[in-house]
């Protein structure tokens, strides 16, 4: 049997059918007095609510019994409550009309925050399936509301260029600004926004990207957009990819049974040293996340098809490459074409780290 959720909320309906918000305008003594003289009800399911005023947790409403109320995107936590209150304050201070936990009956969804009636902010602290996230986004689209997803953080991030392990729902939260994608995050204890930007896929849940933060006091709305990587920053990206390439090769060589190993078979087929691949194999390529295969492997498959003059769409349809969920064949073919144009331009040329950086960074800049 599925367990029902304990739902904590910040908005309730009074006996007079008015909405009462817990946004910090009342101190605890005032709330205790209000609780003694007022009854509260869930704006969605009309069930009675308790006003809870603890010494540690943020004041909030909760259903008197375990609830089947299904209009909330996630069960509340103190982090989620704190984050929503700080975001509410953020928009109020910038003179936006902001509604907390606004219920949209046309789509049976409740936005954590609704800005000027046309922009929903979802502050997501718990895991959500990419499919559910997409369903909620499509719901907002049906009523002409733009949605922005912000990932809640339990601890601050390390800043700079580095290796990131991203879950599928975090990837689904990506926002686009032109050709640049990024994930927006928020750490309530420090009232600080973080960005994971310039994300480049390596394999599985491993990405390379730039993490940078900005205090809420300096944030704008529409939210600030990260900048592309400088050449010096991209060199760090290249160094990480180089180390990840070595790690991948080492794992393949230790895997045993090289005859069945796809990586080893491709190397033999292409007459490449299994322990020392050409520099242009395993490089960062925008859009690599369209393939489930690690960067080294799909690039080897692309080179093998190129040498055999196999059309890219035939390679994709052959089953040798597996598209990620939601990836389109046309997009995947464009990534392969982009990579092979880079590879074939410098195939057979001796490349040092500096010239390789020039090539890959130049191609990265062309995608912006």
Place the predicted regions along the sequence by residue.
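Conserved catalytic cores of phosphodiester-cleaving nucleases, focusing on short active-site segments
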Residues: 87, 111-129, 140
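Catalytic cores of nucleic-acid endonucleases
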Residues: 125-180
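Long, charge-rich alpha-helical interaction segments
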Residues: 224, 229-244
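Extended, amphipathic alpha-helical scaffolds
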Residues: 249-368
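Short acidic/glycine-enriched loop/turn segments that link adjacent beta-strands
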Residues: 57, 106-109
């Amino acid at each position: 049997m599925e367990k029902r959720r304990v739902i904590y909320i910040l908005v309730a309906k009074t006996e007079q059918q008015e909405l009462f918000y817990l946004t910090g305008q009342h101190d605890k003594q005032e709330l205790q007095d209000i609780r003694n003289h007022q009854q509260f009800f869930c704006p969605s399911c009309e069930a009675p609510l308790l006003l809870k005023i603890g010494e540690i947790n943020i004041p909030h409403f909760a259903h008197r019994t375990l609830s089947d109320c299904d209009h909330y995107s996630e069960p509340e936590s103190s982090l989620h409550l704190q984050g929503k209150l700080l975001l509410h304050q953020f928009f109020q201070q910038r003179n936006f009309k902001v509604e907390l936990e606004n219920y949209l009956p046309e789509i049976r969804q409740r936005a954590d925050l609704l800005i000027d009636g046309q922009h929903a902010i979802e502050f997501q602290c718990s895991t959500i399936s990419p499919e559910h996230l997409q369903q909620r986004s499509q719901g907002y689209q049906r009523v002409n509301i733009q949605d922005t997803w912000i990932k809640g953080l339990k601890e601050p991030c390390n800043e700079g260029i580095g290796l990131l392990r991203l879950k599928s729902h975090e990837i689904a939260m990506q926002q686009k600004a032109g050709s640049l994608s990024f994930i927006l995050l928020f750490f309530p204890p420090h009232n600080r926004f973080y960005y994971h930007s310039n994300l480049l896929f390596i394999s599985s849940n491993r990405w390379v990207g730039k993490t940078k933060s900005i205090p809420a006091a300096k944030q704008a709305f529409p939210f600030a957009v990260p900048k592309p990587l400088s050449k010096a920053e991209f060199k760090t990206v290249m160094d990480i990819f180089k180390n990840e390439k070595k790690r991948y090769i080492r794992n393949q060589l230790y895997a045993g049974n090289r005859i069945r190993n796809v990586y080893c078979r491709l190397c033999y087929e292409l007459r490449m040293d299994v322990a020392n691949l050409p520099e242009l194999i395993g490089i960062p390529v925008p859009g690599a996340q369209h393939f489930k295969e690690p960067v080294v492997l799909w690039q080897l498959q692309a080179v093998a098809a190129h040498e055999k003059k196999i059309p890219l769409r035939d390679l994709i349809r052959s089953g040798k490459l597996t598209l990620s969920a939601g990836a389109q064949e046309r997009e995947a073919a464009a990534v392969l074409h982009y990579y092979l144009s880079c590879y074939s331009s410098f195939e057979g040329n001796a490349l040092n780290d500096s010239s390789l950086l020039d090539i890959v960074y130049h191609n990265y800049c062309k995608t912006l």
